Amino acid sequence: MSENTYQIETRRRSRSKTPFLRSSCDHENCEHAGEEGHVHHLKRKSAAPNVQTIIEEHIVESSISKKTRAKAFAQLTSDYSSDDMTPDAKRKQNSITATVTSILTKRSGGATSTPRNRSQLETTQNTLNSAQEKLNQSNGNLSSGNVSDYLAYIEYRDAGEYWNKTPKTDYTYSELSPHRRQLAPGIVAMPNMSRKSLENHNDRVNYMVQQNPAQEEFIRRRYQSKYTQQVNYDSADELDATFGQQKQSWWLIRLIQLVVSSITTVWSRVTNLSATETTAYQNYHAKRQQSQQVGLWWKIVQTIGGGLASLLRYLYVFIGSVLSLDTWLLRSSDAENKSKKRFLIFLLILLPLLLLSGWLLLQEDQRSAYVQRAEALLPLPLSIFGSLRSRFSNAGATLKSWMEVPTVRSPQREAEAIKVNMASIEQNIQKALTAEEYENILNHVNSYVQQLVELKMQQHSKELAPQQIELFVKLMKENLKQIMYKTELSEKDLSDLAIKLKLELQSSGGWQDGAKLSQANLEEITKLIKAEVHLHESHYTIQLDRIDFASLLERILAAPALADFVDARISLRVGELEPKESSGSSDAEVQIERLNREIAFIKLALSDKQAENADLHQSISNLKLGQEDLLERIQQHELSQDRRFHGLLAEIENKLSALNDSQFALLNKQIKLSLVEILGFKQSTAGGSAGQLDDFDLQTWVRSMFVAKDYLEQQLLELNKRTNNNIRDEIERSSILLMSDISQRLKREILLVVEAKHNESTKALKGHIREEEVRQIVKTVLAIYDADKTGLVDFALESAGGQILSTRCTESYQTKSAQISVFGIPLWYPTNTPRVAISPNVQPGECWAFQGFPGFLVLKLNSLVYVTGFTLEHIPKSLSPTGRIESAPRNFTVWGLEQEKDQEPVLFGDYQFEDNGASLQYFAVQNLDIKRPYEIVELRIETNHGHPTYTCLYRFRVHGKPPAT
């Protein structure tokens, strides 16, 4: 039986990125696979706690001995027949094998940081290796290819129903799988695989059918050997799906690049606008001087060439943009994209209509401003039109200035232009300011202009001195001489002009060397010269009429000689007026007017200040009203608090007084009963109604039974007088004994009653907690809640220095709900990282969601700690929309690691989070043999409370004590 037993090792989880370590000996790296007696070291796999031991037995009867069975070992258990078997094998086919398969679940130390659950199938590859050697020895004439095929056939034939016996690594429901996690009866969770399942196989097949296999690039990528070697674990369908995803995502990259390039282009244009204007201003005078030196024809050619070059450049950019847009719209011919293309074409048609309607709604000044801005920013037909318009307008103005006689604008037209300009400026100011601000500015301007006009009138009313007039005439003569000097031509200038004229005539072909001027020609030249001189004289006359006397007067007044002269005249006049003490009415009127102006200005300022003060007073009054309301509320609150406090004190005093009265009333009653019992009043009363007698009856009975002291002394004195000394001594002795006995009995009874009442009152007081104690308890509970709800230090808190080292092969769960999307295209999916599990925020949805089991979380604490316990927190059921917390962790374990890839971790404990318990549950360390501190802790979540898709981890705390320094 043991000879026929073979082991099939559980396959490893394919393509996992988990940093697991290989065993020192496995099937792929074993160098002694063919040796006899060599046993492979099985890899230790994780198994769920609910995996049960399953034993399957397949027994086939046989009549052959063990020797025959050993010889025919190549043929193991099989119910199948084959025609490819050799005759020797057919003769030795009748054999018996019994396969016993068992799964042993055992927790032990492993070679990696994975769980110590081990799945062992009692079938091994050594049997197949030995069978291969025996088959090679018996069938030496077979080729190596046939042997390998035969062994593959034997392996599949002997495995039987391997799909039910061998654990799978993909989406599986096999009860033998070590990765099986049963969340609830009938609900099995998908294992945590890095490769997706075959659930999208039909979609990939449909995609393959739609592709054209005749495409050269598709075939080359599909069957290229070098590309296939890079992805050894990918199937052909997965490659097809990858190519499809790449093909579908390229247009998204194009869109992102287009948006980024547009933003950068606009930003560069805006930032370079000022630099361009500065360069234009700097090059303006240089270009103008150069244009003055260049001839007429060269200017015309240069203007036409520049315009054509700009037109061709912008035309090229426009054609390229249109072609790119057409390519983007017509890039695909799928039927699914027709609606999308129609919508995009509709948007492209709608955009110019919207721009045109917005342009018609704008005003003229706004249109001009937008045109200038667009000409500076956009390299589009609008910019082309603007640049061409400016170039043609400049060229036309230049030609007009060359060809036409310069004209002078009339003063009326200039005045009209100035009025139009002032009206536009006034309209813009009214739009930019409010009515009140505009009126204030007008008032200030009017007052300022009025002051200037009055000052000018005063200055014009004064007569100029002869020296000032002479100075004005001198300056005007100098200016006129300079103007005349500029208009006069010297002999050198005339000769140069004649030479230039001769050269121009020679170049034009109209010059003849032997030609002479006739009398008619001379007369015509004389007329032209006179007309030109007359034209220049009229021009200079007009120029003299157009002299700005205000600027000329300003220059004259700014001359230093005039300032010295005026100062001298003023000092002389002041010296003459000092002896005189006459104050005429004119000076008083001037001062009164000046004071009136100052008063008007002060009134305007005071009105502004008064308006500001009114607003300030209004705000202060509002603040006072709010303050009075707040004070009234505070007083009402204080009164209510005082009333509540006084009522509470009165209630406490009433309770204390009632308690004291009840205690003393009971004590008095008990003392009264004791006295009645001692003195014998109960026996003397009929019917035993002593308990119902009042104090008056008791006092009457005592007086009747006993004698007062004074009366007794009087009687005793009389008796002593009548009796001898012996009788008196006997009476005194008897009274002393009687009183001592009575006092002792009274003391004992009173002490017993007082002690009993004290015990009863103590028990009663123990049942009633004082208000101060209640407040102290509430303060203690609130202090614990404020201290992170636990009152313990969390050494895994991220803000305190904790960090996430790894999640191993755990796959995070994504909701696929796009946070940012453009035209329905998702650009960014928000996900919560594992760092949320060590952050203090616990709100619904603020958790780390992962799929599959087990879920790993490796934490690094902020320091070395003697770990004492853990706290796992989840949202309560009251905050869940469904009223359930199925995604909460259930079974989990905590391990201590010396390093991230520790091969021998230490188990702190195996715990279970109760969904019916509190939302915050504390778990103490179960392994009390741990005597060393740890800095790295690993959390492994095995199951949850029934959610089949994902598990949520809200907050995990690690508590402990730091080592003593």
UniProtKB/Swiss-Prot annotation:
GO MF annotation, one: protein-membrane adaptor activity
GO biological process annotation, one example: double-strand break repair via homologous recombination
SUN domain sequence ranges: 801-963
Bilayer disposition of the protein: Multi-pass membrane protein
Keyword match Transmembrane: yes
Phenotype of the disrupted gene, per the record: Homozygous mutant flies live to adulthood and are fertile and exhibit rough and irregular eyes. Flies have an aberrant R-cell rhabdomeres morphology and R-cell and cone cell nuclei are mispositioned. RNAi-mediated knockdown produces mild defects in nuclear positioning within fat body cells.
Keywords: Coiled coil, Cytoplasm, Cytoskeleton, Membrane, Transmembrane, Transmembrane helix
One term under GO cellular component: microtubule organizing center
Transmembrane segments: 303-323, 343-363
Coiled coil: 585-612
Expressing tissues: Expressed in all cells in the eye disk.
Subcellular location, record wording: Membrane; Cytoplasm, Cytoskeleton, Microtubule organizing center; Cytoplasm, Perinuclear region
Pfam families named among the record's database cross-references: Sad1_UNC (PF07738)
Known function: Component of the LINC (LInker of Nucleoskeleton and Cytoskeleton) complex involved in the connection between the nuclear lamina and the cytoskeleton. Is required to nuclear migration in eye and to anchor klar in the nuclear membrane.
Subunit structure: Core component of the LINC complex which is composed of inner nuclear membrane SUN domain-containing proteins coupled to outer nuclear membrane KASH domain-containing nesprins.
Protein known as: Klaroid protein
Source species: Drosophila melanogaster (Fruit fly)
Primary gene name: koi
